[in-house]
């Protein structure tokens, strides 16, 4: 998988974490850098670990002969489902949850959000088990891009940019669907 495709895939799966960081950033009133760094670190670690876990699960099933014949369709379906769900979720009404800022780093909510926003990376990792790719490069790219975008998202949210999260999620969904379609196209044109 080329570098550009890995980068786009990483941006696509990082969109949910970016959106959550923007929302969390709107509530941060003190200790912005420290709290944004912790949030971005947690999101980055989850986004790096989950595709590895998914890849190992996918590789377990990749050896089954009939799956090898349809592997490109599996990758397309997983990426398409995750991308479509991201777009769908972006148009759903938001909860009117008010986040109270007590000035402390809140690890538990960050870990829950990190897990929730990385489920798509798990599915992507499963799909990538069926194509030729260096999963370590993908995992490092996903983790580092998620870290950077989450850090930026918290800063943007803190400075009044709460509306960016929705559009980032939509763009991320479109990117994932496009990469899935490209996998099928490359297989069918080979």
Swiss-Prot record:
Keyword field contains Manganese: yes
InterPro entries: Mntp/YtaF, Put_MntP
Membrane topology field: Multi-pass membrane protein
Main location: membrane
GO annotation, cellular component aspect: plasma membrane
Coiled-coil annotated spans: none
Domain of life: Bacteria
MF-aspect GO terms: manganese ion transmembrane transporter activity
Transmembrane segments: 3-23, 37-57, 72-88, 111-131, 138-158, 164-184
The keyword Manganese is assigned to this record: yes
Keyword terms: Cell membrane, Ion transport, Manganese, Membrane, Transmembrane, Transmembrane helix, Transport
Compartments where located: Cell membrane
Matching PANTHER family: MANGANESE EFFLUX PUMP MNTP-RELATED (PTHR35529:SF1)
Protein function: Probably functions as a manganese efflux pump.
UniProt similarity note: Belongs to the MntP (TC 9.B.29) family.
Full protein name: Putative manganese efflux pump MntP
Name of the gene this protein is made from: mntP
